Every structure is written in structure tokens, then in C-alpha cells.
Amino acid sequence: MAGHGTDIDFCTLGMFIIDEIEFPPPKPPVRDIVGGAGTYSALGARIFSPPPQSRSVGWIVDCGSDFPRQLRDYIAQWDTGVLLRETPDRLTTRGWNGYVGGNEHRAFRYLTPKLRLDHQALQGTPLLWSRSFHLICSPSRCIDLVENILTLRKQQDKSAEARRPIFIWEPVPDLCTTDEFDNCLKALRYIDIISPNHGELGGFFGKNTHGPDHADYRAIEELTSQWLDSGIGPDGKGAAVVRCGKDGCLMACKGQRKWMPAYHQSAEKVADPTGGGNSFLGGLAVGVLRSGSSSIMDNVENGAVWGSISASFAIEQVGMPVLSHSAQGETWNGVCVQDRLSDFKQRLASYVQP
């Protein structure tokens, strides 16, 4: 059993899915692609966690009777704190992805029944003691998960209450609606960071956050301010990070807000945006956790920098980036993560707020 919170820095309750992707002709379809929100968020945290720190990245993979051997080998190469659960009485969760209207929008449907993860999956595992959790769910489910995770921790260790983990909530797109607005405000009190994309943010308020050429910066700031005024976090000191694709992200906490650009400024560098947002959140979580500043905004800004880098690797190809090893250390898609991080920080020094 891992020590309480010492071994696992990050745990996602997003799912692992095997993807089948159908492109517009004449490009042939691809099958048995590693995917799912949980996988991409684990990737985001893993990119900033070379071994032995890689084992601090927690995620759960439910392996059905048809789970491909090569995917087991692939997952093992990441050397993470993954929990592989054998479920031989079912098929692995699989999804179909098809492009609608060119390359802009990817439609999705499940090909096999999904097996959703909840707090029970953490019981009796080191993942329960993670220092941060990524939740991708509805507002009401978010509240349930936070309450149940904290209850489980307290049941096993009475002093766990003093070591509250960071909860990062990614609202599930289908339920970012005005009907869920009040539930959303309730859920904000339970988590530390909320991170929707700008369309999902607008959905809760019934507002359009898309401008003609780029995201509507002022509308996004205004709606985010309303969340902050309502209160994010148990003590009202939480933050919002609104992801805006090619336009970067808005980071905001009480009394402070700041925009950050996306790493890739050219559309040519983006092969497939799928998983970019999830990867961002994995990088964000470990970036906030390992920042070590007493300033909430400084921690969130460090997290957003790391998240932007993680997302940049996720969207350069269909599926996962290629992990390689050299004398100098790990590379992803042939690039050293620290080199890309340094490059990004240099660019941020001259970035003009929109």
C-alpha cells in the first residue's frame, strides 16, 4: 500500500477507451488506438513525470476479454502507477470517432458498453491517497465523487481530513446547460479548480462565447467572474481555467485574471485536437501541485504553462505522442519536454494580453 498521498501525485477518474477513427476519404480508418479522457489526462501528467516520478501518475484501465496484448505492452512502456483491472466477463470499452464537416468536429459513439469509474474503484488502492484528482462528470456527480473520496480517506485514516487533495473538475459537455447552472454553482464549492472549454462555460449561462475569428475574451472574463463571485472551493479561494483551443486559456482566481496563449500558433502543427483538453488538465494538476508557491495564482499559472505543453504534444498526431529514450533523457515526438517548456516561457515574456 502506498503511503498516504506520498506516492501518487495525480489520479484521474476518466475512462480508458480503445478508439476506432474514421477519416474523410481517401484517408483510411485507424483501429485499436489508445484513447479516452482518462488516458489523455494521464498522458498530460506523465509528460512532466519522467521515471521514477512516472509512477506517481495514477489511472485505471479496465481490460475486457478482448483487450489487445500490444496495448498492455504499450501502457507498460509509460511506467506509471496505472491500475489494470481484469474484467473478463465484458468487452473493453470501445468508441467510434468520425469527422463531420471536414476536420473540425469529431463525432463519437460507444461501440461497447462503457464501465464508468467512481470512488469505489479507489478503495484499497494507492490511488485513494492521490494528492490531486481529475474528475470529468456532471455537477451532481462531481459533488458525490468529492464527498465519497473524502469519506473513504477519513474512514481509513482519521487525520486524512487535514491533507485534503486538490480536486480539478472538467464538466462533461452534455450537461453544460442552463438547466444545470444551479447545480454547477453548488459543485464549485466542493472543488479547487474548474476547467471547462469556453463553449462549455457559455453553455451553463446560455451565452455565446465564440467571436467571429477568435473566442470572445470579454464575455469569457465576465462569465468566469460570476463563478468567482459565487465562490469556487470550500474556502472561496479556488480558481477557474477556461480552455479556448487555439486562443489559449484564461486563468482566474479572486481578484486576479490572466490570459495565456496556446503553445502551437499554427494550425499546421495540429493533426488532431482530440484529447488536447484532457491532456491539458493532467499537466495542469501536476503543475499546480509541484509549483510550491504560496500564491494560488502563481500555482495556477505554473499549472497552465505545463498544461499547455502537455496539450501541445497530444494534438500533434492521431492518438498518443511517441515516447523515446536517449542519453539525455526522455523525448516525446522527438522533443525534450524541458526544451519546449523553456521555449514557451521565453515567448510568454513578450505576450500581450488580449
Predicted regions and their residues:
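A short, glycine/small-residue-rich beta-strand->loop->alpha-helix junction that serves as a flexible
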Residues: R31-A37, A219
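Conserved phosphate-binding/catalytic region of the ribokinase-like
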Residues: M1-G14, Q155-E161, E180, G206-P354
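Conserved N-terminal subdomain of the carbohydrate kinase-like
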Residues: I18-R31, I47-I136, N148-L150, K158-R164, ...
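Short beta-strand scaffold segments in enzyme catalytic cores
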Residues: L43, G95-Y99, G248-A252
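Short glycine-enriched, charge-decorated loop/helix-capping segments at active-site entrances
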Residues: P26-I33, N208-H214
